[in-house]
Amino acid sequence: LIYDTGGSGVNALRIVSSLPSNPAVTAILGPLTLEEIYSLAGLKSPLPILIPKSASPGLSDLSQNLFFLSPSSKTIAQRTAQMMVRELGFEHIAVLSHGSGKTKLMTDYFLEECHQLGIDPVAVEWYIEKPENLSRQLKNIRRAAWSLVPEKKPGDQIMNLEIDSLDALFDVDVTDFFELPPEDEIMDRKDSAKVFLETIQAMYIPIRPDELTYIGTQLPVYNLKTVLFGNENWLDMDLLNQEVIGPHVQGMRVISDVSSALSASNQDSFSNFHALALDHAGFIQSIIDRGVLKRRQFLEQLRNQPGFHGKSTSILFIGKNKNENGSAQVLEYAKKRLRTLGVYNGESFSHTTE
C-alpha cells in the first residue's frame, strides 16, 4: 500500500490513524517531513513507523512507535568523540566551530561526550560571522599546541652524555661530541608559523554548507600536523580535491550515517533516498525472513534485532525504547577518494574490506 501525505502533518496523522484497522499492514515505512514526524510523535499506534532519516535528538525516547533508521546528530557527535578517545586513544583535542544553530548544537554534543570520557579539549574556538578570516581562532589553537611542547632544560643534552672512562684521562671538551648552535638559531615558541606542530592529536571542525572554501584554505597555513575530524559538509568532492585543500587534509575522518559511496555523492538527494530505500527494504525483509508475520512479533524482533549491515547503512537500535539507530559509518579521505573504514556503534568498531 502506498499513500501520499502531500507533506502535510494533518494528512500523515489521518492516514496513519486509519491503518491499524487493516490486518494486512504490519508496519509503516516512509520519508516524512519534520512536521509529519512531530504530528505522529504523540500518536499511540500498534504499528511501528520506520523513518529513514533522524529527527530531533530525544524524540525517540518520547515516542515508542517511531523507529529512526539513521543515527541522530547527537549520536554522530558522540561517536566522533568516542572514536577519538576510545578507539584512537587521543587526549589532546582541539575544536573549531560556528557558534550558533545546528553546528553549535552538534559541537556541544561532542564536547559533552568528551567530558563524559574524561577529556577536556586543549582548545575550543568559536566563530559567528562568515569564516573569511579565522586568524585569531587558529592562532589560539596554535598557541595551545605550543603549550603542549615539552620544555627542554638547559643542561639536558650535557647531562645525557656518556663518556668512556679512557677519555677521562684527557681533556674533554663538549664540542668533541656535538656542536652547539649559534645563539640566533635557537628556536622557541615565538618562532614562525613554518614550524610544524604535532602536539594536538585531533581537531574537530564541523562546518556549515558553503564554508569548505574558507576553512579548507586557511587551515593549512597554521601547520598543525593532526588528524582532522569533519562532518558531511566537508564532502563536496570537487572542492575538497582541489590542490589548495585536499593535500593538506589527508587522512581526514568523517563519522556519517551513510557509507563513503553515498556520502561522496551527497549532492544528489534522489540517489541517496533510492540507496537508503534499498537498504531499508532489505532490513525489513531480514526480519520477515525469520518467520515473523504478526504485528506484535514484528515489533519485538524490530527492537531486539542483533544488527543489520546493508550496502550503504548499518542499523542497530539503541536507547530507552530501542528505536534509534546507534551505528555510524567511519569514513576516511585520502588520495582524492573517500572510503569506508568500518562501522562504529560506540562499543565495537567493525572494519570493512573496502
Spans of model-derived segments:
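Extracytosolic ligand-binding ectodomains
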Residues: 1-354
